[in-house]
C-alpha cells in the first residue's frame, strides 16, 4: 500500500470516532491518487510471500508466527523487522509494531513506509510526542495537495499542546496563510473536536478579530457557548452568523436548539422549518422539531417529525426513545413499548462499542 493511502485509511478510521459535537463537519480521507514520495521501493521478497498472504486474509497471528520463525532461522534476514512491524500494525498492536519498525528504519533509513508506520504506531498507541518527528518527515514527502498527513500531524501538535505548529499544519492542509483568519478558524474547529474548548474559543475569537465577516466563525463560537450552556451568548453568535451567512441550514438548527433551551418553542419551530427547507437530509432538525412540538402539546405532529427522522436513520436510539414517549402520551402503549425497547437495545449496543 502506498504512503498516501496508509494515511488516508487512518483518517477514515479517525473520522468515525465519536466527537464532542455531533454536527461538527467530518474530514473525509483524501481521494487523490497515490502520492509521489521520496521513498525507496521495497522489492518483493519470496521469503515473506506466505506471511503476506496470511495478512491479506486477516490471519495476523499466523503471519506473525511465521515471520518470527523466519527470523529465528536467519537473524540477519533483510526486511524481517519491517515485515513484523507492518504485521503488528495491521493487527492493531501498535507497541509491538513500533518495537520492530525502529530497527527496520535503522536498517534502511530511506524506507518511507516504515518511517510512516512508526509515526502512526506511536500516534495510535497514544504517544504523539514520539510520533511527531516521523510524521514531520512524512509530511515533507507528500505533495501539497495531500491533506491527510497534515491533518494527523496537526492533531499530534494539539495533543502535545503545540498550538502554533498545529495551526501551521492545518493552514497547509487547507492551503491558506498560517496567520490568516481562516487558519485560526480551521484550528479552532479541530481543537473543538479534540475537546480543547478554551483554546478553541481563543482561536475562534482571534479569527473574528482578524476577519469579523468570515463565514462560520460566529457559528463555531455559538456552538461553543451552547455546549457551555451560555445560551444568551450562543444566541447572539448564531444571529451574527445568520446576518453574514443566511443560507446556512445548520445555523438555523443550532439557533433553534438555543431557543428551545429557554422555552421559546414558537421561535424554535420557525427556525427549524427554515433549516429543513434549506437541507432536508439532516436528521437533527427533525428530531429537535419532534421535541419542540411535543413541548407545545402538538404530539401528533411531533410523531410525524420523529417518524421522518427514523426513516432517515433507523439506528438512532434517541429518536426511538422520543417516539416511544410521544406514543405513550397518545395512549398508543403497544407502539410506545416497542419503540422504547428498540431505543434501549440500540443504546446498549452503542455503549458496548464505546
Where are these regions (language model features)?
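Canonical tetratricopeptide repeat
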Residues: 83, 117, 151-152, 186, ...
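Helix-start (N-cap) detector for alpha-helical repeat units in TPR-like alpha-solenoids
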Residues: 44, 78-79, 112-113, 145-148, ...
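Alpha-helical segment of the N-proximal tetratricopeptide repeat
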Residues: 43-76, 86, 90, 155, ...
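Structural marker of alpha-solenoid helical repeat scaffolds
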Residues: 73, 107, 140-142, 175-176, ...
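Terminal, low-structured helical/coil segments at or just beyond the last alpha-helical repeat
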Residues: 27-35, 318-354
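Structural signature of tandem alpha-helical TPR/SEL1-like repeats
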Residues: 57-65, 90-103, 125-137, 160-172, ...
